[in-house]
Regions:
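Glycine-centered tight beta-turn/hairpin loop motif at sheet-sheet or coil-to-beta transitions
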Residues: 1, 21-23
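Structural detector for short beta-strands of small beta-barrel domains
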Residues: 1-11
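Residue-level signal for tight coil/turn positions that link beta-strands
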Residues: 12-13, 47
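Short aromatic-glycine-enriched beta-strand elements
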Residues: 14-18
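Beta-strand/loop nucleic-acid-binding surfaces
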Residues: 24-35
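Short, Lys/Arg- and Gly-enriched loop/turn segments at beta-strand edges
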Residues: 47-53
């Protein structure tokens, strides 16, 4: 499985709400995401790790 790209739509307390490029919505705990993640950030999930794109 290749990388999946997401855009952070909103942050609600300890969770980021994001949408993948294919339109799938996801909610992820902020502590799992890279430092500096904000609304509008582009993230890549690959091999169970997150990084800023």
């Amino acid at each position: 499985m290749g990388p999946i790209y997401y855009t952070v739509d909103s942050i609600d307390g300890d969770y980021a709400h994001m949408t993948s490029d294919s339109g799938v919505e996801n909610q992820v705990a902020m502590f799992l995401l890279p430092e500096g993640t904000t609304v509008g950030s582009r993230l890549v999930r690959e091999v169970l790790e997150w990084r800023l794109a």
